[in-house]
Regions:
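Conserved, well-structured interaction surfaces
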Residues: 1-50, 81, 98-103
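Extended ligand-binding groove/face enriched in aromatic
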Residues: 33-73
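Short coil/turn linking the two alpha-helices of tandem helical-hairpin repeats
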Residues: 47-54, 105-106, 128-131
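Hydrophobic-face positions in mid-chain alpha helices that act as interaction patches
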Residues: 130, 136-194
Length: 194
């Protein structure tokens, strides 16, 4: 919720930012798009950690997590929104991110959100919601933006999930990939060049 609050602060301050030229306006759009995207990912993580899975027939009555979309300090007790309400907020944030990022130049690094990351993540959310056709449509939009494949044949060292891998469209931080991926003894040969 601390990270959500930071996103809320930036989103709430949008109208306080003076943009004197197109470059400033594009930067503001990018920042707003990233904040909406990040807030969606944080709520997605929370609802999937602390609530039951999304089931279309019960999502409206299944307790989710509290939703707060304002940075204002309020003296009140927040109650859990339904799983459906949380997912609606996630999709609303992703729609806002799409609006903000669709005409913005793609980021130069994987550490900033681009439109392809929005499509990929929305596709994932829609899969969790069992909205199969919508998920397929957003996945196709992402592939239409960028459809690179990394050839792992002959890969010998380094990390396949890195900033120079064309398949990675967004990375939120860093990971110690070598500590979480293991190959069974004798299986590395499955990835050697033919």
């Amino acid at each position: 919720y601390e990270k959500i609050d930071r996103c809320n602060m930036v989103i709430d301050a949008e109208n306080d930012v003076a943009c004197d030229n197109d470059e400033d306006r594009a930067l503001l759009r990018h920042v707003m798009g990233e904040c909406h995207y990040l807030r969606a990912t944080y709520y997605f993580t929370l609802v999937n950690l602390y609530a039951k899975p999304y089931v279309p027939s019960t999502a409206e009555s299944t307790p989710g997590v509290p939703v707060k979309t304002s940075s204002k300090v309020e003296d009140k007790e927040y109650t859990r929104a339904s799983v459906a309400e949380v997912y609606r907020q996630i999709l609303a944030d992703l729609d806002a991110a799409e609006t903000d990022l669709k005409d913005v130049k793609s980021p130069a690094t994987i550490y900033h959100v681009g439109i392809d990351a929005v499509y990929i993540f929305r596709s994932r959310v829609e899969m969790f919601m069992q909205e199969w056709q919508k998920a397929a449509d957003d996945a196709k939009r992402a592939l239409d933006e960028d459809s690179y494949l990394q050839n792992l044949v002959g890969w010998k060292d380094g990390y396949p999930i890195s900033s120079d891998n064309k398949e990675v469209v967004y990375s939120n931080g860093a990971s110690c990939f070598g500590n979480i991926v293991f190959l069974a003894p004798g299986k590395k040969s499955n990835y050697d060049s033919p």
